[in-house]
């Protein structure tokens, strides 16, 4: 069983519109990197966000922020969090576990852009929507974190390798 499999299966069952980003996406694209959290970029419709929040709560996840998690489904509240609280992601965690899910609410790559060239990667018998290398690099460029700088270098190497394989 892959980490987060229960959530990912439920997302699939409920037809949640999302794309995997962050460290797990880096792993799925071909780099070895230690990470325990899963970042997702989701379609920001109220209905889709309500599905995500409901699934995470049912699976035992809690919010780190001292706010009602259903607020993420309200566009006015989301905008307040982004502009007044400088929030970029909404974090859910599972007690006594390293598992965390970050719903990205502010990104240089929109869900629509990510979905346009999403990669579908099959792991076992589940197909995962994963952000493209180019879009993931765009997301990681302005974070200022050293891990993201390393990820960008790895992603560029993977892209170059894949382009080289396409020449054959």
Question: Which stretches of residues belong to each language-model region?
Answer:
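Compositionally biased terminal segments of proteins
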Residues: 1-168
């Amino acid at each position: 069983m892959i980490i987060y499999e229960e959530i990912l299966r439920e997302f699939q069952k409920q037809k949640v519109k999302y794309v995997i980003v962050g460290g797990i996406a880096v792993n799925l694209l071909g780099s070895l990197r230690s990470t325990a959290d899963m970042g997702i970029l989701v379609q920001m419709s109220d209905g889709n966000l309500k599905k995500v929040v409901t699934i995470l709560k049912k699976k035992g996840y809690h919010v780190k922020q001292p706010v009602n998690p259903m607020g993420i489904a309200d566009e006015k509240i989301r905008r307040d969090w982004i502009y007044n609280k400088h929030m970029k992601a909404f974090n859910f965690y599972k007690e006594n576990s390293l598992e965390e899910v970050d719903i990205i609410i502010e990104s240089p790559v929109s869900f629509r852009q990510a979905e346009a060239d999403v990669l579908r990667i099959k792991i076992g018998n589940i197909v995962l929507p994963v952000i493209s290398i180019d879009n993931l690099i765009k997301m990681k460029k302005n974070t200022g974190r050293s891990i993201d700088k390393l990820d960008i270098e790895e992603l560029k190497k993977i892209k170059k390798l894949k382009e080289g394989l396409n020449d054959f």
